[in-house]
UniProtKB/Swiss-Prot annotation:
Renumbered residue ranges of the record's region Transactivation domain 2 (TAD2): 833-841
Species assigned in the record: Xenopus tropicalis
GO cellular component terms given for this protein: nucleus
Top-rank taxon, per record: Eukaryota
Region: Required for macropage invasion, residue numbers: 749-806
Biological classification of the source: Eukaryota, Metazoa, Chordata, Craniata, Vertebrata
Annotated keywords: Nucleus
Protein name: Atos homolog protein A
Region called Transactivation domain 1 (TAD1), residue ranges: 24-32
Length: 946
């Protein structure tokens, strides 16, 4: 009956539903791209490699994180399918980088109904998780073994190889889809896939799990994916030429080139935009565009009510049309538009003319109208880190493409209309781009999209205080004009550049890696709107009437105000300005207490220091020690702050003591760093820790104590009441003690050094930190290996302070109340590492506890001796015939076992070791070998648990 019980209870450490979720999350998050040498990492929701080991930093999900939302969605989908006994399918696919966003790794399953997405996606893997009836007979593998196999497959997959080679740059748009496996397949492999079937584990008493994966064959190079929009560019070139096609041609003059907007209300109510392979912004309409300058990091969101229509000619003015209220703040000079909204409103009625489209082209555009509008919401620009391209090559490539479109779309009738009625531009926004010295000065803008529907501009600032630069604040009820904007003018006034350059030297505005307005305007456009731009270092946006004090300059048109102090609210009534004074000594210890004092004295500081006293404005790059804000408040609390920091510092320096059965003296329980004389030999001065284990010439061979130890002056007085270890004294001691007597304040030493140390009867001379041990077991199942810290101590046991073996203690309390679960019979392996991560000893212990009753306990001790080799009598000498004085104890391991009520076997409480710090197998000059002996209690072998 016991094997049946083991087969039913032994291997199911996880619930079946949780195990399915682990597998799904490992597939979807096991290859999260990151910019590193490895190129990928496991997401925070992936199961750890060692589930039994406590995680150092446990992840807490937040609804604000997209990855957490996707993980929660995956959990719910997998749980729903599993509860309904439906096979689960996970598809891994790639999308082109040009027309799909790289922010979201997952998308709704409904989007796969889109014919354009079906055509654009490249299917890499198709995983199938199918519940099957429980396997009969011998078990195949455990759930954890399957988890490791899936992790290994994910690690060595084609997708991981691409990420590793590119250091996380490509692929960027990875799509995961969780669905029912019995649904109709919406995507097919481009080549015949290879299939791998994993071993089938049992996940419950009557259900097993079959996991299989179909993957695309390995490819030597990364495939270049083109979306359906860009791949049909040649189709338009071939079809437009033989057909009659009327399009409004922009009027070319010697001064500037102006491109009109799309004019077909029916076919272009939602214009399509595309980003080329080099990251260029194109208007995918049938008008001729002249784009010759890269626009980096462009994400375009398509809306119908509000937005922009954007074009970027090389060095001329470009007309824009927009509807509704607009608010945008470019975070660096040109080419870094992060988010704009597109509408299909033409520039002016005069420029709008009906277009006679070809029926074939018109039907194709009408069919893809909704598809293009949805894809346009996720348009993005290739990242600067992925490709660095030359502007001259971009100009040449675009000019050739635009030339083809112009030649194919022009006819005689079209040219006549251009001569008779030139287009009239009525836009209110003009941009000029300078390709000279500004290219090298541009830096990457933050990835925060700026939507025209947002009332307040949002910025993502770096956690590094030095990277927090000046932000642009504006009122939500007024228009915000950027430095690249002009009010209904096609030329740029030069007076605006002078206004910006007239800023004081102390208020110099610098660029940062998170994007900001450069004062080196040169040939750039400047702001011509009548708005008051305020540049501040705070991360809170405060209305203008509450953010500046009377001491600042009065508001003037086209005069930015610069404030380098943090502005905030308290109880919605008033603001406070705080500046923390940097101290050179004990800054880290006093920081917390100083902030607490400042928080307590906020009210006094606000009323005692009015706002009109803030007469000087500091630059954020100046030395913070020059800031004299809150000087009075800090003088008041500095005394208390120093006292509190000292008390806090003292509480953090409490020593950590080992847990044992007797109380050790604080005078003798010291760390290795605090030992002066006892760590070295008093006569020779040599280090005692590196000496070999002393050989005791005694009858027992168990590191017996010498009687001369009792006369030492260096030992503590608590050990002086113990007399010689004779049989008479031992009997007399046993007679004095009874089971009803209370325990002595300090327990006496036991019969030999081994027992005294293992039972914590010795006071340690010091402790050594940094030892670790890897604990594992094998048998009918293999539990997860664990790496645990080892508390190591050493002792003084001889008259010349010769070193003793080290005592190591591995606490299993972190694994739970029961301990470390092991098979009923098998092998336990404990690998000990020193602080240098070098193996000191590998203990391998065989055991058999299959006959151990439930709710019982026992122990096992393995001793390893160095035994001389006698070649002349090899094979004739038995273990019993070996004399005790011929062997020396080298290593020892003490294990404790207990059984639960259901009969499961656990290693519990701790594992105790005796060893030498150095890996000393045998002496080089002697013929010795190591032999191990295992001892267990015999009468009784098992005892009931308390």
């Amino acid at each position: 009956m016991k094997p049946d019980r083991d087969s039913l209870d032994e291997f199911f450490e996880y619930e079946a539903e949780d195990f399915l979720v682990y597998l799904a999350l490992l597939i979807t998050e096991g290859r999260t791209p990151e910019h590193s040498v490895k190129g990928r990492t496991e997401g925070p929701h992936c199961p750890p490699a060692q589930l039994s080991q406590p995680a150092p930093n446990k992840h807490e999900c937040s609804d604000k994180l997209a990855q957490c939302r996707e993980a929660r969605k995956t959990r719910s989908e997998v749980a729903f399918l599993w509860r309904n006994n439906i096979p689960i399918m996970v598809e891994v696919m790639l999308l082109p980088d040009c027309c799909y966003s790289d922010e979201g790794a997952n998308t709704d399953g409904n989007d796969l109904n889109d014919p354009a997405l079906k055509q654009d996606a490249l299917l890499l893997e198709r995983w199938t998780l199918e519940p099957v009836p429980r396997q009969s007979g011998d078990r195949f593998i455990e759930e954890k073994t399957l988890l490791l196999a899936v992790r290994s497959f994910v690690f060595f997959s084609q997708l991981s190889a691409w990420l590793s080679v590119s250091h996380g740059a490509v692929p960027r748009n990875i799509l995961y889809r969780v669905s029912a496996a019995d649904e109709e397949l919406k995507l097919n492999f481009s080549h015949s896939p290879t299939e791998h079937v994993f071993p089938v584990p049992n996940v419950s008493h009557n259900v097993a799990l079959k996991v299989s994966v179909q993957s695309l064959p390995r490819q030597s190079s990364y495939p270049v994916l083109n979306c359906s929009i860009h791949s049909n560019l040649g189709f338009y070139e071939k079809k437009i030429l033989p057909r009659e096609h009327s399009v409004t041609q922009p009027h070319n003059s010697q001064d500037n080139d102006q491109n009109s907007a799309p004019v077909s209300q029916h076919a272009f109510t939602k214009p399509s935009w595309s980003v080329g392979p080099e990251g260029l912004l194109h208007a995918r309409t049938n008008v001729s565009t002249d784009l010759s300058l890269p626009v980096r990091n462009s994400k375009l969101l398509s809306t119908v009510d509000k937005g922009y229509s954007i074009g970027t000619p090389p060095s001329k003015h470009q007309c824009f049309s927009m509807t509704g209220n607009y608010k945008a703040a470019p975070q660096e000079p040109v080419r870094n538009f992060k988010s704009f909204s597109l509408v299909g409103v033409p520039c002016s009625p005069q420029a709008s003319q009906t277009v006679e489209t070809n029926p074939l082209i018109g039907s194709l555009i009408q069919e893809r109208q909704e598809v293009i509008a949805r894809i346009a919401q996720h348009l993005l620009q290739c990242d600067q880190t992925s490709s660095q391209i030359n502007s001259h090559s971009i100009i040449n490539e675009l000019s050739s493409i635009n030339g083809k479109i112009k030649n194919s779309s022009e006819d005689e009738k079209f040219q006549k209309k251009n001569k008779e009625s030139p287009p009239i531009c009525t836009s209110t926004l003009a941009l000029t781009l300078s390709t000279g010295n500004q290219i090298s000065n541009l830096k990457k803008a933050p990835d925060t999209p700026i939507n025209s529907s947002r009332p307040i501009l949002e910025f993502h600032t770096s956690p590094n205080p030095q990277a927090r630069r000046k932000l642009i604040l504006f009122e939500s009820n007024e228009h915000f004009c950027n430095p690249f904007q002009s009010s209904g003018q096609s030329t740029v006034p030069s007076s605006n550049n002078e206004n910006i350059n007239k800023l004081p030297e102390k208020r110099d505005i610098k660029q940062s890696e998170h994007g900001e307005i450069s004062t080196r305007t040169g040939n750039q456009l400047s702001n011509s709107c009548n708005t008051n731009d305020r540049l501040c270092t705070n991360t809170q946006i405060v209305p203008e009437d509450k953010s500046c004090t009377d001491s600042f300059h009065k508001p003037q048109k086209d005069n930015p105000k610069i404030c380098s102090q943090k502005v905030g609210h308290r109880n919605g009534q008033a603001q406070e300005t705080t500046c923390r004074e940097t101290r050179k000594s004990d800054h880290s210890n006093q920081l917390l207490s100083i902030e607490n004092c400042i928080n307590k004295d906020r009210d006094n500081i606000q009323y005692k220091e009015p706002q009109d006293k803030l007469k000087s404005v500091h630059d954020e790059n100046e030395d913070p020690t020059n800031c004299d804000c809150l000087a009075q408040g800090q003088r008041k609390c500095n005394g208390n702050c120093l006292q509190r920091s000292e008390s806090l510092k003292n509480t953090e320096q409490k020593p950590i003591q080992l847990r044992h059965s007797c109380t050790w003296k604080k005078q003798t329980f010291r760390s290795l760093d605090g030992i002066s004389t006892k760590a070295f030999h008093p006569r020779t001065g040599l280090p005692l820790l590196s000496s070999p284990v002393p050989q005791r010439k005694t009858q027992s061979g168990y590191f017996d104590l010498d009687n001369s130890l009792l006369k030492l002056k260096g030992l503590s007085t608590q050990r002086q009441h113990v007399n010689g270890f004779t049989d008479e004294d031992t009997v007399a001691t046993n007679k004095q003690l009874s089971s009803s007597a209370p325990p002595a304040p300090c327990l006496s030493l036991l019969g030999n050094f081994e027992e005294s140390v293992l039972n914590y009867r010795f006071e340690p001379l010091g402790v050594v930190e940094g030892f670790t041990a890897e604990v594992g077991a094998s048998g009918i199942f293999c539990p997860t290996h664990m790496t645990l810290p080892v508390k190591v101590s050493f002792y003084s046991v001889s008259d010349d302070n010769a070193p003793s073996p080290y005592m190591g203690n591995i606490t299993l309390e972190s694994l739970g109340k029961r301990g470390y679960r092991i098979p009923p019979s098998g092998t336990i392996q404990v690998t000990l590492f020193n602080p240098n991560k070098t193996v000191v000893k590998m203990f391998v212990v065989k055991y058999d506890l299959r006959d151990m009753p439930a709710n019982h306990q026992t122990f096992l001790r393995q001793r390893t001796f160095s035994v001389p080799v006698r070649r002349e009598t090899k094979g004739a000498v038995t273990e019993n015939g070996l004399k005790a004085e011929d062997r020396t104890l080298r290593y020892l391991i003490h294990l404790r076992f207990q059984s639960s009520k259901s009969g499961k076997i656990y290693l519990h409480r701790d594992v105790r070791l005796l060893f030498s710090r150095k890996s000393m197998e045998v002496d080089s000059g002697a013929a010795y070998e190591l032999k191990s002996y295992i001892e267990t209690p015999t009468n009784p072998q098992y005892s009931p648990r308390c």
